[in-house]
A protein has these predicted regions:
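Hydrophobic pocket/interface hotspot
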Residues: 32-37, 43, 66, 79, ...
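Stable alpha-helical elements in mature extracytoplasmic
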Residues: 29, 36, 88, 140, ...
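Hydrophobic/aromatic beta-strand elements that line small-molecule binding cavities or substrate pockets
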Residues: 22-24, 75-81, 102-110
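Hydrophobic ligand-binding cavity/cleft-lining segments
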Residues: 14-55, 153
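Short beta-edge strand/loop motif at the mouth of beta-sheet-based domains
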Residues: 41-74, 85-87
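Beta-strand/loop substructures that line and gate deep hydrophobic ligand-binding cavities in soluble
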Residues: 93-142, 146, 151-153
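Sec-dependent N-terminal signal peptides
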Residues: 4-13
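Sec-exported extracytoplasmic/periplasmic mature domains
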Residues: 38-42, 84, 145, 149-156
Length: 157
């Protein structure tokens, strides 16, 4: 019993690391998919987010700030990598969610017929959130999958 208690305390203090990645093929040229998915300020249209914005607004650029909200929670990330038609990476700056680290990688590959989009999130839990870590990890994977299906529906019509 003492061992279980010590392990629980350790996880609570250190944090749990997780990673979720999902992909989908969208029947549209890569430039059409890029135009929608790279618009980080428009992610509220196909995700569970209540709002999303990019500063400065417009085309995504390295150094831009991506601000999202969901309910009472918010997240503020910096865009760290932009390779047009290939990749976008972001890294968490500040959040009210129970995580200490959060980074996203969106990758694109395709041609004039179809595009594969991959969405990967790496994160580390914080505090009480670690107690629910397995559930949050599973939920995140499901949420990414649902968001990609919504994206596909929006683009394919």
């Amino acid at each position: 019993m003492k061992k279980v208690f010590m392990i629980s305390i350790g996880l609570f203090l250190i944090g749990c690391k997780g990673s979720q990645e999902r992909s989908i093929v969208i029947n549209a040229p890569i430039n059409e998919v890029w135009a929608v998915f790279s618009d980080l300020g428009g992610h509220e249209h196909f995700t569970a987010l209540d709002s999303a914005s990019l500063s400065p607004s417009g085309e995504v650029a390295k150094g831009a700030t991506w601000y999202v909200t969901q309910g009472k929670n918010f997240g503020k990330s910096e865009v760290t990598v932009v390779e047009p038609m290939k990749k976008i990476e972001t890294k968490l700056i500040e959040t009210s969610w129970p995580v200490t680290k959060w980074s996203e990688t969106h990758t694109y590959s395709g041609d004039s017929e179809s595009t594969e989009v991959s969405w990967k999130v790496d994160f580390t839990g914080k505090g009480v959130g670690n107690l629910f870590f397995p559930f949050f990890n599973a939920y995140l994977g499901s949420d990414i999958k649902k968001s990609l299906k919504n994206l596909k529906k929006i683009i394919e019509g």
